[in-house]
Amino acid sequence: MTTLHNLGFPRIGARRELKQAQEAYWAGDLQQSELEHVGKSLRERHWALQADAGVDLMPVGDFAWYDHILEFSSLLGVVPSRFEQDANAPVNLDTLFRMARGRAPTGTPAAACEMTKWFDTNYHYLVPELAADQTFRIARESLFEQVEEAKAQGHNPKPVIPGPLTYLYLSKGDRFEGAEDSAKLALLDNLIPVYREILQRFANQGVQWVQIDEPILVLDLPDSWQRAYLRVYDQLASASQTKLLLATYFGGLGNNLFTALELPVHGLHLDRVRGNDDLGQVIPRLGDKVLSLGVINGRNIWRTDLDAALDNITALHNELGDRLWLAPSCSLLHCPVDLEQEDTLDNELKSWLSFAKQKLEELALLGGALRGNSNVNSGLQTQRAALQARGLSSRIHNPAVAQRLADASQLSRDRVSPFAERIAQQQHALQLPAFPTTTIGSFPQTREIRTARRDWKAGKLNDAQYQQQMQEEIARCIRYQEEVELDVLVHGEAERNDMVEYFGELLDGFAFTRFGWVQSYGSRCVKPPIIFGDVQRPQAMTVEWARYAQSLTHKPVKGMLTGPVTILQWSFVRDDQPRADTCRQIALALRDEVQDLEKAGIKVIQIDEPALREGLPLRQEEWTQYLDWAVDCFRLATVSVDDDTQIHTHMCYSEFNDIIEAIAALDADVITIETSRSNMELLDAFRDFHYPNDIGPGVYDIHSPNEPDVAWMVQLMEKAAERLPKERLWVNPDCGLKTRKWDETRAALANMVNAAKQLRQAS
C-alpha cells in the first residue's frame, strides 16, 4: 500500500494561537507553563488533523517556538557565548527566545542572532553561530518529548531534523567565509557523534523512520560539500537502527542527484513540483530504497491537477509498488492552515484554492486512486470540475491589461540624466545635511490603530471617521519626527495593515483571505494576497495620505510604495502565466502611482524591494533571466520621474555580493539596507563594486526591543565610511518600525539622530 506522509505542518495554528501565546508570554501576561500548554494543544490538534486526512507517518519536530533551525541549535547546544549558557546545563526556553529576540522574561539581554531568508521563501530562520572549535551536545529534550506525545496519541511518529551538512552550510562564524566555506566541514568530527546519539535516542523510542532534511542538495554545491555527503551518511547509517528518509525540496537535485542516490539511506524524497530531475535516471539507481515524490505544491494555494499527477506516477507505482511514497513537495509551513475557515471568499474563487488541510486531502485522493479505491472518484471529479471552471472564468483575463503589457516594451527604462547630475538637483531641492537621517517607512501599529481599522472594516466607523483617525495618527507621527529632528520624514503607514496586502486590496486581480496566515518569523505572521487575474490600478492608492502628511511639514515626506517584485514574491501568484508577466502588470500599476505622487508634490518616493534577492532561482544558471526581468520591472515602475525627484529603495536580510550589478542596475538614487546584525559586513560588496549611488546602511536592529547605543551606531557608521564615501551615506534603522512599541521607537530614533549629529561634528 502506498505510504502517504507529510514533511511538515504549519505550526502557528489556524487562528494564530501560537503568536498570541508567544506575545502574551513575552509581555509577562502568560506563564511559561501556559505557553507550553498552548504548544502542546496545537501539536495534538495538528497531528489529529493530519491523521484524519490519511497521513501514515506523522512529522514530529516541525513544531518550533520561534524557528525550527533555532530549535535544533538549542538541541545541539549551539548557543553563542554572549547568552552565558552553562556548558553543562540544558538550554531553556528563555535562552532560545533571547537568541531570537535579544531578550526574554528571564536572562540577561544580548544582541539577537542574525536572521535571514529560508532559501527562496518568505520564511526566515535564525542563523546558527559556530565557533572555530564548536562543540555539540544534546542540550534540550523537547524533540524527544514530542515523539512521546505523538506516540501517546496513537500516531506513528517520523521525527524531522535538519541534516548535518545543511545545518553547517546555513551556519556562520567569525572564522568562516560564507556558506560554502569548506572549513566548516572540519566540525563534522564533533557534530556527527551527536547526530548518531540523536538517532539512537529515536531508536530507543521505537521510531521506525527519521526524516533528515538536506535541502542544500538543490543548490550548486562545491565539490568539497558534495564529497562530504558519502562520508557523513556512512557514519550515520552505520549507527542508525531507524530508517533514514533523506528529504530534499525547493528544486531539482541536478548534478547532486547521483550523490543523493549513492547515500546509504532507506528513502529519498524529491520535489516534483519545482524539480525536474529525470526519473528515468533515478529508478535504475534507486536499488531497494523508497522513493518519496512531492506531488502536491507545498508553497502555493491552488488546487492540484490530480489527473496530471496520476498520469505522472501511475507507471512508477506499477514499477515500485509500496516503495513509492507520496507527499507534498515541501513542508506545508508555507501555506495557510485551513480553507474551510474562509467565509468571505466568493464560492467561485474558493473552489480554485487548497490550503494545508486541503492539500493533505488531495494527497489522500491520489493515494486512494493508486490503491484502486473507487470512493475517491467523486473527489477527483470535483477537482477536475474546479480546474476546468477556473480556466474558463472571465475574471482571469482583462484585454486592456494585455494591451498595455504589450505596449510596455516601447516605454523607456532610463532616467532622464545619470545619477551624478540627478543628485545635484536633488540636493538643491531637498537641502539635506551630511549623514541625512530617515526611517524605512512604518511606525508602530498601536492598539488604537488596529482597532480603528477593524471597526472601519466592520462598518462601525464610516469612511470620514476612519480618515480622521488615521490623519490624527499621521500628524502625531510627523510631529514626533520633527521633534527628534529627522531629515526626511515618513507618514508612518498607520492606514496600512501590511506592506503587500494594503496595495493588493486596491489593485484589480487580487483577492484576500480572513485567516490565510503564514509564518514569516517568530510571532510575525503575514497574510499573502492571492493574485488570481490580470492586475491594474483603478485609482490612486497612497496619494491623499502622502499629500496630507506633506502639508504638515516643510521637511520632505517620502511617498511609500511596495515594489513589483516584492508584491509578487509575497503573494500567492497565479500559475497560469509566467511570473514575469504578472510582475510587469504590477510594475505598470505602480508606475501610475509614482507619477501621481510626483504630481502631488512628493519629491522623495521609496519603492521597497526587500524580496528582490529571495526571488533568485536557487541554481545560478537561472539567475540572469530572473534578474533581467526583475530589474526591468523596477525601472518600468520608477524611471518616469523628473531628475529632482529622489527615488529610494529598501532591501533587508540580503546578501549583495553576487547580485551587486543588478542592484546597481536598479539605478535608485538611495538604497537602504539591513546591516546592523551583520556588523556592516554587507557593505563589502558595495565597496568592492564601487557602487555609485547613495546608501543607508541600517545602524540598529529593529527586530530586537533592545535600545541601540549611540556610540555603537557611530562606530557602525565609521565602519561604513571606511568602505564608502561618507558623502554618499545615510543614517537609518535597518527596517520598518511597525512591530515596535512607541517607547522603544522614541528612544531608538533619538539615539540614532544623536549618532548622526556626532558624525557631522566629526566630519
From Swiss-Prot:
Residues bound to 5-methyltetrahydropteroyltri-L-glutamate: R16, E17, L18, K19, K117, R524, C525, W570, E614
List of residues binding L-methionine: I440, G441, S442, E493, D608
Alphabetically ordered keywords of this record: Amino-acid biosynthesis, Metal-binding, Methionine biosynthesis, Methyltransferase, Repeat, Transferase, Zinc
Pathway: Amino-acid biosynthesis; L-methionine biosynthesis via de novo pathway; L-methionine from L-homocysteine (MetE route): step 1/1
GO biological process: methionine biosynthetic process; methylation
Cofactor(s) needed for function: Zn(2+)
EC number: 2.1.1.14
Cofactor note: Binds 1 zinc ion per subunit.
InterPro entries: Cbl-indep_Met_Synth_N (IPR013215), Cobalamin-indep_Met_synthase (IPR006276), Met_Synth_C/arc (IPR002629), UROD/MetE-like_sf (IPR038071)
Designated name of the protein: 5-methyltetrahydropteroyltriglutamate--homocysteine methyltransferase
Primary gene name: metE
